[in-house]
Amino acid sequence: MPTDSVMEHQRIWFEGLNRGDVSAADAAFASDCVVHITGVPEPFRGIGPWKEFVAVMLNAFPDLRFTVEDQVVQGDRVAFRWRATGTQKGPLGAAPATGKAVAVDGLIIDRIVDKKVQERWEQWDQSLLLQQLGLAG
């Protein structure tokens, strides 16, 4: 897969996230995508449930900003390391807004089919996020 195709998928998705635009998923993910996140018991199956999860995070952290720190492309797989920063200004599950700033690093491996994410494996430290919010010890 040409690197330009990968860069375009990544650009669309992260620019959308940084604008708070969940609909960017429509251009970056297949409608029947599967997204696995370490620590989440079941994968998100389909773009609808994935967008709902992302919307919850963007509501909790409306100033959420992602940067891609590193990227590797091999065949139909794209791996990248990212950093997210934001301030919890909305509820996160049962936890009310704390007003606290967070910074979290993560890793993603995407399997690309027809220039869209068909399957994603994502790992980031949810415990660190909760600690930064004062919600875990």
Q: Where do the PLM segments sit?
A:
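C-terminal and inter-domain tail/linker signature
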Residues: 1-137
